[in-house]
Amino acid sequence: MRLKAEIPCPSFTLQYELSFTNMLNMLRLSGVPIKSCDRKELKNIVVAGGPCACNPEPIADFVDIFFIGEGEEVDLEVIELFRKCRAEGKSKQEFLELSSKIEGVYVPALYDVTYNEDGTIKSFTPKGDAPAKIHKRIMLDMDKSFYPDNFVVPLVEIVHDRAVQEIFRGCIRGCRFCQAGIIYRPVREKSPETINKQCRALCDNTGYDEVSLSSLSSSDYSQIVPLLDKLNEWSKDEKVSISLPSLRVDGFTDDIMNKIKTVRKSGLTFAPEAGSQRMRDVINKNVREDELLQTCTTAFAGGWTTVKLYFMIGLPTETMDDVAAIAGLGQSVVDAYYKCPEKPKGKSVRVTVSASSFVPKPFTPFQWEPQDTIPVLHEKQQHIKDSITTRKIQFNYHDADTSYLEAVFARGDRKLCKVMELACERGFHFDGWNDCFSLEKWLELFDECGVDPSFYANRHRSFDEILPWDHIDYGVTKDFLIRECKKAYADTTTPHCRLKCNNCGAAKYGKGVCFEKRKNMV
């Protein structure tokens, strides 16, 4: 199947750095020149957005327009401008210059980048009237956010084969490795009435019998219990199950448990992220081991026999003792099952321990930190394996090679564009799939282009270094990120936004939990 080359604005959502080659491959297959400078006319304007637009520089040569932030409104404004410019016979350059004046629009071609002798960025200079700082767009009233409730349901089975309903955007917690928890600040909730109406429409129009209430931390929705009550008024009779895929360890209560198992028990997944309390303090997870064990005991008493635990290895200051503690925490959950008098009779427990590799991301307190080398990550993965002593625990881990390439592109600059161009010419695609990925071939590309990938993945940055994304504003100040990074090295936690305003900068938007908390403190 080929794209049609006459599509006016081919647009891409970039959720994952290893999907960059897929975007270029789609353009190539459509007959559209992959480089922006080779597309001269006002057609085939390539647009991209999503989380990876936080650092657009590694693909700046290929994309005409990036949407910075949330796209529900800015996309309509750019489309309307595009129609107007075409009707008036304006050039592509004129359209791009006008687009750059829309808040949330970044046009890479309107900026020049210079570099120091050591390869770091020396300056980032806008051309003409292009803004020096690109500010993100934000949807302040989530009840007015467009949400599709009638769409084509795939004929084949897909990974997330269920209806998905966003209940709020942002996160109050502030985990120091988490990019989404920063770039989607402040927290903004949909009303229970809007959520209920949209969930009902989703099920009526698609035939799905499961609704997943989606957010970064669903149990942090301020009206979660009234919402579940409202949903259960119709979902129970219609045999529609409600799942909360993103649960805090300290947010899973008896009340919530009983409300989400009325039709069928969905899987339970918790993310302690680190095995030791010291490491959980470093990353500001603010979860204690006794809270996790109590939560799991509650689930076991409610009939659950399987639990998934998500962890991360390679975090700043991590030691091998911290790594071994991951296996130890998994064992403690197994022990909690057999100590629970109300556990299901005659059934065994299954605990899945999954460990991803830390990838430093832009706009996080750890954006200056190096990633562990691949051999060190392999050593830590093996250490967890060796520390597990029971068959009740299944251990899964992410491929360290793909995590390395992810780290390269997550914090890369425009010098990586020539690598991406060559990768497209050589047919690289589906790099997020192990059967299509070869780190050896990627390393050959880097070497051929004279680019050192470890410069991006394994190098510690100083706080005063100009970063490739410093010209972009996601609402949270660099001073706040620096403070949080320093607190991590002091093993010091920060309270969440509903307890205390930590002056991250997001209150400037004038809405959301951050603003309300700050207003009440003044």
Locate the predicted segments by residue:
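N-terminal pre-triad scaffold of radical SAM enzymes
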Residues: 153-177, 203, 244, 357-359
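Radical SAM enzyme core and accessory elements
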Residues: 389-522
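Short secondary-structure boundary/capping segments
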Residues: 27, 61-66, 82-84, 182, ...
